[in-house]
UniProtKB/Swiss-Prot annotation:
One of the GO BP terms on file: bile acid biosynthetic process
CDD domains listed in its UniProt record: CYP7A1
Provenance organism: Sus scrofa (Pig)
GO cellular component, one term: endoplasmic reticulum membrane
Name under which the protein is recorded: Cytochrome P450 7A1
């Protein structure tokens, strides 16, 4: 009698053969080169997930600047020539950026669709977010973040500021703790329950956030959250803390959160809270590793440390601000923060080396895509993808691309450099850690400002040094490739000590 395992093997083999004969997509005339992969449905997903950059480079060498890969049942057209990026964006009427992003958000955070076309919101949620993250609203948010960062950092100097001692800590852990607490209370307000209780609440939320963030890549990939018991529990606890009855007890809630609660008026309280959890994740998941890389690269480079410290001191002096341990926090306005080209260059260079975002748009109909390298037919529901890390690490655009150069984004006059070339042609898009076009991160201005504020305070309050002065740069954690800024695969110990103010 045929064994069950043998029968199962035969059935699997037959199914694979049927897929190869009937279900496998075939390249049509005028379409980009096609890679189906050898595993039904998964296609090339395993190879791409293992090392996206090398996978795309290999296919670029094999097929040229555009090719199609099957990934988890989707057909993705990768555009790898940065000279064609702006041409992709010119086809906006054929492309839908919302479908993928809103679907991924609903999967990961557990709320109903927040796409306005589905009727669950009273307004375009993306417009609401943009409106509350620019202009006067951004100024208020940045001022609150600057104050909260100082409230979080000041306990580091206690209890004997007259006899400062070195404190050793993991740099990523330090950045995670400081940025999470300051960012959380900036957006969602302070609970008037006393300092110790507030600190305990934040630490609990921090632990839950880490647990949830661990499983986030799997959720976006389509795995059900019930598979991850600890991560699922963490998500529900985080969302519970963002319910309306909890928020009403807090002081100084941001305009962003208040406006979103109004915009999501058709959702019940539980789903509103899960939508706000999406805001929490978006405000922390990339900012925290970005902050680490900026601080690490600055401390590691004596030239960067010297140039940054000089710029910070000059800016504070010009603004009439003095670092002290009294109750008066320092404050820099929008114009002053925007007039710091050295810090801007350090942040850009750090993000260039650590970002691995995937810019995605879905074809709304069959159409012809006209690029720098030719024209290609695209089918409805196919995905157009840009992977800017290819550009960020291109030696023709960025000589010696793996080396941190703090002044890479400064011109000969010390001003912001905006001119970069590929094959002798000026690039319109040369720096894309925050996406592009309609998919550009609406919180990018605030993210850069809070990182800049953190660096200003760290350089002003503390003497800083690495425990191992010649430590190697930690590898990037590739498990988050496609989601934004990659964290370090291991922490780096550093020491900080209060300056004699």
């Amino acid at each position: 009698m045929m064994s069950i395992s043998l029968l199962g093997g035969i059935v699997t083999a037959v199914c694979c053969c049927l897929w190869l004969l009937l279900g496998m997509r075939r390249r049509q005339t005028g379409e980009p080169p096609l890679e189906n992969g050898i595993i039904p449905y998964l296609g090339c997903a395993l190879q791409f997930g293992a090392n996206p950059l090398e996978f795309l480079r290999a296919n670029q060498r094999k097929h040229g600047h555009i090719f199609t890969c099957q990934l988890m049942g989707n057909y993705v057209h990768f555009i790898t020539n940065p000279l064609s990026y702006h041409k992709v964006l010119c086809h906006g009427k054929y492309l839908d950026w919302k479908k993928f992003h809103f679907t991924a958000s609903a999967k990961a955070f557990g709320h109903r669709s927040i796409d306005p076309s589905d009727g669950n919101t009273t307004d375009n949620i993306n417009k609401t977010i943009i409106k509350t993250l620019q202009g006067d609203a951004l100024n208020l948010l940045a001022a609150a973040m600057m104050e909260n960062l100082q409230l979080v950092l000041r306990p580091q100097v206690a209890p004997q500021p007259e006899k400062p001692a070195w404190v050793t800590e993991g740099m990523y852990s330090f950045c995670y703790r400081v940025m999470f607490e300051a960012g959380y209370v900036t957006l969602f307000g302070k609970d008037p329950i006393g300092h110790d209780a507030q600190k305990a609440l934040i630490l609990n939320n921090l632990d839950n956030f880490k647990q949830f963030d661990k499983i986030f890549p799997a959720l976006v990939a389509g795995f059900p959250i019930h598979v991850f018991k600890t991560g699922h529990y963490a998500r529900e606890k985080l969302a519970e803390g963002l319910r309306l009855q909890k928020l009403r007890k807090r002081d100084h809630i941001s305009e962003l959160v208040r406006f979103l609660n109004d915009t999501l008026s058709t959702l019940d309280d539980a789903e509103k809270a899960k939508s706000l959890l999406a805001v929490l994740w978006a405000s922390q998941a990339n900012t925290i590793p970005a902050t680490f890389w900026c601080l690490f690269q600055t401390i590691r480079s004596p030239e960067a440390m010297k140039a940054a410290s000089e710029e910070v001191n000059k800016t504070l002096e010009k603004a009439g601000q003095k670092i002290s341990l009294d109750d008066k926090p320092i404050y820099l306005n929008q114009i002053e923060l925007d007039s710091m080209p050295v810090l801007d260059s350090i942040i850009k260079e750090s993000l260039r080396l650590s970002s691995a975002s995937l810019n995605i748009r879905t074809a709304k109909e069959d159409f012809t895509l006209h690029l720098q390298d030719g024209s290609y037919n695209i089918r409805k529901d196919d995905i157009i993808a840009l992977y800017p890390q290819l550009m960020h690490l291109d030696p023709e655009i960025y000589p010696d691309p793996l080396t941190f150069k703090y002044d890479r984004y400064l011109d000969e006059n010390g001003k912001t450099k905006t001119t970069f070339y590929s094959h002798g042609l000026k690039l319109k898009y040369y720096y894309m850690p925050f996406g592009s076009g309609a998919t550009i991160c609406p919180g990018r201005l605030f993210a850069v400002q809070e990182i800049k504020q953190f660096l200003i305070l760290m350089l002003s309050y503390f003497d800083l040094e690495l425990v191992e002065s010649h430590v190697k740069c930690p590898p990037l954690d590739q498990s988050r490739a496609g989601l934004g800024i990659l964290p370090p695969s291991n922490d780096i110990e550093f020491r900080y000590k209060l300056k004699h103010l």
